[in-house]
Each structure stands twice: as C-alpha cells, then as structure tokens.
C-alpha cells in the first residue's frame, strides 16, 4: 500500500493536469494582482474618498478572496474544474489501459482505491488553494495589513469565523484555506467515484 501510494502521489504531483490547473489559477491571480492590487498600491489615496466611512486600501479588502471584482467570481466558478482536472480521471484511464488489473493481482482492491483516493484529494485541494495563497502573499507584500473594519470586507459579524477575522485575520485566512482545500479535495474525489 505504501509503495503504491508513493507511486500514485508521484504521478499526481508530476501530472500535466495539475500543472495546467495551477497555471490557470495563477494566471487569474496574476491578473487580479496587476489589474487591482498593484495600481492601488502605487497610488493608495487615488481610490480613497474623503467624507466616507472608508479605510485606506489594505490586504483585507484587496486580496482576491475578499475584494470585489470578476477575478474571484471567475476563480470560484472554475474551482470544480481546477480541482477535477489534475488527477481525478486517472482511475478511468488506468482501467482502460489495463493497469488496474495489474494492481488488483498484487493487492486488494481497497488498497488500490485508497492509494488513488488520497492523491486525487490532495491534488484537487492544492489546485484550488495554491493560487489564492500566492495572491495573498503578493498582496501582503505591497499593501498595508491591519485588522478589518466590519463594513470593509464581505464577511459580516454573523459570518463564519467572523470573530477570528476581526481579531486575527491571518488565522482566518489559514482556516479559509483549509476549508477550501477540504471542499475542493472532496469535489475532486467525487469525480473519482463517478469514474
């Protein structure tokens, strides 16, 4: 089982599908950074309106998952594809090529399915979360970071983990990444079940 899992993990993280998914996510993240974050970072007062209850642009309201705009909307719509493309269809292709029969003669079916399930889950989660992590790191590098004010972020006081967001935003972001990783991984494994 361990050797099979090692082989499947190596196949999964070297697959062209994972590279394509990561590339698509990183392109969306880079577009967001260069179209929204960088212009604001170069001239932070240009977007600031006096007389309103607004804060200066910061990480909390500028990075892709918390800001407004088409970038995150497109990214969220593509997450099911980004999660499934990397490695989920390999069971079907292995079955068509006859590799599955080779594995079944050497080990139990549950061992092979488990060794296939774990890489599918991990690649799906990685493809969904890595571009957001890169966007947060890039945004944090050029924008000021301070605790969010309730009306400047899409999460209100009744939202999930809002008490953490308004006291420790980076812990909130870490929890958000973990939740998204798990959801994307489960989404990717659903396609494994179908195949």
Residue ranges and their predicted role:
Residues 1-25:
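Aromatic- and glycine-rich beta-strand/loop motifs that create alpha-glucan
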Residues 1-9, 110, 114, 167-174:
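Alpha-helical membrane-protein architecture signal
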Residues 11, 102-103, 114, 192-195:
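Conserved catalytic-core segments centered on acid/base and nucleophilic motifs
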Residues 25-85, 118-188, 192:
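Secretory targeting signals
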Residues 90-122:
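Helix-loop-helix units of permease transmembrane domains in multi-pass membrane transporters
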């Amino acid at each position: 089982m361990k050797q099979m899992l090692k082989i499947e993990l190596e196949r999964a993280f070297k697959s062209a599908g994972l590279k394509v998914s990561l590339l698509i996510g990183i392109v969306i993240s880079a577009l967001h950074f260069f179209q929204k974050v960088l212009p604001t970072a170069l001239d932070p007062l240009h977007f600031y309106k006096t007389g309103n209850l607004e804060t200066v642009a910061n990480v909390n309201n500028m990075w892709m998952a918390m800001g407004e705009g088409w970038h995150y909307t497109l990214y969220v719509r593509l997450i099911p594809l980004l999660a499934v493309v990397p490695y989920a269809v390999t069971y079907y292709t292995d079955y068509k090529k006859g590799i599955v029969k080779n594995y079944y003669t050497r080990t139990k079916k549950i061992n092979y399915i488990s060794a296939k399930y774990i890489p599918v889950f991990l690649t799906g989660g990685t493809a969904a979360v890595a571009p957001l992590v890169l966007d947060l790191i890039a945004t944090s590098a050029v924008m000021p970071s301070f605790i969010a004010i309730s009306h400047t972020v899409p999460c209100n006081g009744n939202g999930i983990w809002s008490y953490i967001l308004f006291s420790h935003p980076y812990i909130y972001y870490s929890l958000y990444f973990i939740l998204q990783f798990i959801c994307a991984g489960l989404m990717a494994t659903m396609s494994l079940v179908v195949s």
